[in-house]
Amino acid sequence: MKIHLVSGLLLLLITASCSQKDATKKVVSFYHWKSKATINQQYQQALKSTNTHKIYLHYFDIVSEHEANWYDDGIFPTYVLKEVDPAYQNFEIVPVVYITNQVFQVSNLEVQKLSNRIKDLVHQISQKHFKKDISQIQIDCDWTESTKYAYFELLESLSDEFDLDVTIRLHQIKFKEKTGVPPVKKGTLMVYNVGDLKDFDQNSILQNSIVKQYITADTKYPMPLNIALPLFSQTVIKNKDNKIKIINSVDRPTFENDKHFKQINTSQFEVVKDTLYKGFYLSEAYGIKLEELAVTEIVDSYNTIKQSKLITNEILFYHLDKNSLSNINLSELVEKL
């Protein structure tokens, strides 16, 4: 009798332990943000190692190209998804539509007309590449206090047809009384591009000290949030007029070994002699900032979010890209998150 009782208790403990592990298991997804959704061995390895089942696939941008006139409202889709590898049909796809804030500053904006155009194009792309309609989409927009009413009206219209997820920036969490809370049931907190590109003492991609300026232990938000984290690095070039250009990669050995550049500190360089770099003409005195991410910085920033009162769900990495996946130890990162 005692043997059976002990065996039963052991089985119960093992089952409980497994249940706890399952409950805390990380759910990881990826963004794909290119007009041609290709797949290669590197992508496949990243998806397999993280047990990813969902891809947030960029479908198109909506931009305001010119002032409204007699012929049109100046609002058009750009960077429309052109090709999709059949391998993506094995994943749950969440279409992503990026809308610039300027769209909602257009005078006499016809929100319902814009909503219908977005619905139609999403369905067209889904049918073309996946032979079906997709019910869940993500809307990505860095709205402001002055544009919230038009943006929220659009979300309400889109909600009639789609299960919506919307992106939320750090400032929209901290200042939610001003920027408002979108009329949706779930969101994705964008924990990247948090700083100032022009501030060469910052890593504008991600810096935990900046995240802490917006998120505290008492921070709340009235909807569950996925957490979007960066994998990418970038080179920031600042000219004499303080204007910025970005190169979506970092080639540290070139700056450290080429005599056209002088190293100021770990991340900063100065052009000391005119030169060409990746198609950009760099003049003497231009500033160079290398923005690279360490696993520890991503983990620390993520922990700042987790230690708040925000309700969090899956982890979403930006993004499936050769340089991004080459510059970060993905296995180590996922293990530490």
Predicted feature residues:
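Chitinase-like catalytic core of GlcNAc-active glycosidases
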Residues: 27-32, 63, 69-189
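C-terminal motif of bacterial Sec signal peptides marking the signal peptidase cleavage site
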Residues: 14-17
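Substrate-binding cleft of secreted/luminal carbohydrate-active enzymes
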Residues: 232, 240-337
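Conserved beta-strand positions in the central sheet of alpha/beta enzyme cores
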Residues: 54-56, 138, 188, 316
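Boundary/entry segment of secreted carbohydrate-active catalytic domains
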Residues: 19-47
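Catalytic domains of carbohydrate-active enzymes, especially glycoside hydrolases
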Residues: 40-65, 125-130
